[in-house]
C-alpha cells in the first residue's frame, strides 16, 4: 500500500510552535508530511529560504516522517510532483478561513487530485503568527514560549547581531 503523503506549505519566516503543532498533528494522520517552504514568499522575508530550511530541518530532525523541501510555482503542481494528495492548512481564526477557502477552491478548480485539509490551530497558538513573533522579537520582547530555542537564537542574531 502506498504511503499517504501530505504537504504543509508556508513561508515559515520563522517557524513557530503553532507550525510545529500542525506538523505533529498531521503526522498522526498521514504517513509523511512534507514541509514545503515557499520560495516566492521571499519579498519581505527576515530569513532567507536557505536559513528557513536549515532551521526547520534541525527542529524536525527527530521526526523522520517529516521532511523539508522548497517549492515555487503552483502548489498543486508541486503536490502532484511529490506524490502527495493532500494540502494541510492551519486556521487560527475565522479571519483566516476566507483567504484559505479561496485558495482551496482555486486549487480544486485546477485539479481534483488534491484535497485541502483545514486544521484548527490548538488554543495556545490561536493568536500566533510569524509576523507577531518577528515584531515582538524586534522590540526585544519575550518569544521563548512562541518559538523553539534555535529560532529564538536566530531571531536574536538577526535583530541584535
From Swiss-Prot:
The keyword Cytoplasm applies. Signal peptide: none annotated. Its EC number is 2.7.7.3. One of its GO terms (biological process) is coenzyme A biosynthetic process. Its main location: cytoplasm. Coiled coil: none annotated. Keywords: ATP-binding, Coenzyme A biosynthesis, Cytoplasm, Magnesium, Nucleotide-binding, Nucleotidyltransferase, Transferase. It is found in: Cytoplasm. It is an enzyme of class 2 (transferase). Pathway: Cofactor biosynthesis; coenzyme A biosynthesis; CoA from (R)-pantothenate: step 4/5. It comes from the Bacteria. Its cofactor is Mg(2+). ATP binds at residues 11-12, 19, 90-92, 100, 125-131. One of its GO terms (molecular function) is ATP binding. It catalyses: (R)-4'-phosphopantetheine + ATP + H(+) = 3'-dephospho-CoA + diphosphate. The record marks 19 as: Transition state stabilizer. One of its GO terms (cellular component) is cytoplasm. Disulfide bonds: none annotated. It holds the Pfam family CTP_transf_like. Belongs to the bacterial CoaD family. Reversibly transfers an adenylyl group from ATP to 4'-phosphopantetheine, yielding dephospho-CoA (dPCoA) and pyrophosphate. Homohexamer. This is Phosphopantetheine adenylyltransferase. It comes from Citrifermentans bemidjiense (strain ATCC BAA-1014 / DSM 16622 / JCM 12645 / Bem).
Amino acid at each position: 500500500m502506498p504511503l499517504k503523503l501530505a504537504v504543509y506549505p508556508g513561508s515559515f519566516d520563522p517557524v513557530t510552535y503553532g507550525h510545529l503543532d500542525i506538523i505533529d498533528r498531521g503526522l498522526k494522520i498521514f504517513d509523511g508530511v512534507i514541509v514545503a517552504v515557499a520560495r516566492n514568499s521571499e519579498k519581505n522575508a527576515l530569513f532567507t529560504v536557505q536559513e528557513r530550511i536549515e532551521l526547520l530541518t534541525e527542529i524536525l530532525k527527530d521526526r523522520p516522517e517529516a521532511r523539508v523541501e522548497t517549492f515555487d510555482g503552483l502548489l498543486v503542481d508541486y503536490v502532484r510532483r511529490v506524490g502527495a494528495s493532500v494540502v494541510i492548512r492551519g486556521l487560527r481564526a475565522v479571519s483566516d478561513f476566507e483567504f484559505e477557502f479561496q485558495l482551496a477552491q482555486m486549487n480544486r478548480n485546477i485539479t481534483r487530485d488534491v484535497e485541502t485539509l483545514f486544521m484548527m490551530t490548538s488554543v495556545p497558538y490561536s493568536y500566533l503568527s510569524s509576523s507577531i513573533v518577528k515584531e515582538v522579537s524586534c522590540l526585544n520582547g519575550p518569544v521563548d514560549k512562541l518559538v523553539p530555542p534555535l529560532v529564538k537564537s536566530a531571531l536574536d542574531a538577526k535583530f541584535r547581531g
